[in-house]
């Protein structure tokens, strides 16, 4: 028997990656960007949910709940991240507690956008202890067309 779409989504949600202490700062951003690049690959908005999984709790307090986070990522401010064509991630600086990256996204309209992306190591006890999580993504800086 086929699973209902709701049951299927629950099953597919288990395929999303969750933070663990072995995932390095740049890999966190890569996981988030790869999800957003193929936003509906596992189920509708699976990429946004993948990104949400690696958001720092302090970030989630400001941008959440998930339904609000989805609307924010689909807004004019961040919509170019959804189903973008390609991205590059360049480390700008880091310590043992934080790392800052420049992310350049080529959107589906072939326009480049630059973001500053920051991750921090979660230090409190619990399942997220020592995991790298996204604390801040800047507003996009348009860099113009690729043509």
Put a short name on every predicted segment.
Residues 91-147:
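Exposed beta-sheet edge and beta->alpha loop/turn motif
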Residues 12-13, 60:
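N-terminal secretory signal sequences
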Residues 1-11:
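Single conserved hydrophobic/aromatic residue that forms the stacking wall/gate
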Residues 16-21:
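TPR-adjacent "capping" and linker segments in tetratricopeptide-repeat scaffold/adaptor proteins
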Residues 43-96:
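Short solvent-exposed beta->alpha transition segments
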Residues 24-40, 54:
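Short, aromatic-enriched amphipathic alpha-helices that serve as compact interaction elements
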């Amino acid at each position: 028997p086929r699973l209902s779409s709701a049951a299927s989504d629950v099953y597919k949600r288990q395929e999303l990656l969750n933070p663990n202490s072995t995932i390095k700062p740049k890999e966190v951003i890569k996981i988030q960007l790869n999800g957003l690049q193929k936003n509906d690959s596992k189920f509708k908005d699976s990429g946004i949910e993948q990104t949400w999984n690696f958001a720092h709790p302090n970030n989630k307090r400001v941008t959440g709940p998930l339904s609000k986070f989805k609307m924010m990522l689909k807004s004019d401010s961040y919509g170019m991240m959804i189903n973008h064509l390609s991205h590059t991630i360049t480390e700008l600086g880091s310590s043992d507690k934080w790392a800052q990256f420049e992310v350049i996204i080529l959107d589906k309209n072939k326009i480049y956008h630059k973001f500053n992306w920051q991750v921090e190591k979660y230090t409190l006890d619990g399942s997220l202890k020592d995991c790298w999580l996204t604390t801040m993504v800047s507003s996009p800086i348009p860099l113009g067309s690729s043509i």
